[in-house]
A protein has these predicted regions:
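N-terminal strand-loop-strand
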Residues: 1-26
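Solvent-exposed, well-ordered amphipathic alpha-helical segments
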Residues: 7-11, 41-42, 119
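Unchanged
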Residues: 31-116
């Protein structure tokens, strides 16, 4: 499961994890036993950022070759606020659309999710 977080007013929240690359990424995680994809999204967003989810929309599914799994992509509108980061998140920030596009690495699921979210919402 992977989530692109937006405040609905043009800002996107991205995180940089302590254990991964130095790049900014979308919130993502694995579904636990007896958990729906939506419950996983809510849990991961709360755990990694401390942000409150206001709305969630399924966008698409994506194959993630690194772990040989299928990721379900969501666009989540969250309440813009201060981050409360987990131990696995080094830093997080709010970024405008163009900056967020630049920060997400080319060829990643996060970049694809952003592209597809924009297409579904305003035809770009």
């Amino acid at each position: 499961m992977i989530c692109l977080l937006t405040d609905g007013a043009g800002k996107h929240a991205l995180i940089r994890q302590t254990y991964a690359t130095r790049n900014y990424v979308c919130v993502a995680g694995f579904i636990k036993d007896h958990e729906t994809a939506e419950q996983t999204a809510l849990r991961e967003i709360r755990e990694e950022t401390g942000l409150e989810v206001l709305n969630m929309r399924y966008i698409s599914s994506y194959y993630y070759p690194k772990h040989d799994n299928l990721m379900l992509g969501y666009l989540c509108t969250v309440k813009h606020g201060e981050f409360r980061l987990s131990g696995e998140v080094e830093t997080a920030g709010w970024f405008g659309l163009e900056e967020a596009r630049e920060l997400l690495s080319h060829g990643t699921v996060g970049k694809d999710l952003m592209r597809d979210s924009l297409r579904m919402n305003d035809g770009r």
